[in-house]
Amino acid sequence: MNLYESCVRGALRAYKLTLSPLIGRQCRFFPTCSEYAAEALIGHGPVRGSWLTVRRLCRCHPWGPSGWDPPPPPRRKGAKWTCET
């Protein structure tokens, strides 16, 4: 585990121990928003992972969708975008 991954996991653990009990378990999705954030930040890095996390948090509200919503799989390094018709 590298330093970045340790920091992400530590920050999410601190959230789960301090703020999460006050807010309650109200996430409409699985994995929960904090688990999604960990997977997105570690799998995609700080920039894209943060963007994916913000998008997910914007979808997590009482009138939004619910259910299974995992982060997209990480892009392979060196992979090129292609468009098949």
UniProtKB/Swiss-Prot annotation:
Signal peptide start and end residues: none
The answer to whether UniProt assigns keyword rRNA-binding to this entry is no
User: How does this protein sit in the membrane?
Assistant: Peripheral membrane protein
Entry GO terms, CC: plasma membrane
Under the heading NCBIfam families, the entry gives:
membrane protein insertion efficiency factor YidD
Function summary? Could be involved in insertion of integral membrane proteins into the membrane.
As for subcellular location, the record says: Cell inner membrane
UniProt xrefs under SMART domains: Haemolytic
Sorted alphabetically, the keyword list is:
Cell inner membrane, Cell membrane, Membrane
Q: Please report which protein family the annotation says this sequence is part of.
A: Belongs to the UPF0161 family.
**Biological classification of the source:** Bacteria, Pseudomonadati, Pseudomonadota, Alphaproteobacteria, Caulobacterales
Record carries keyword Cell inner membrane:
yes
> What's this protein's name?
Putative membrane protein insertion efficiency factor
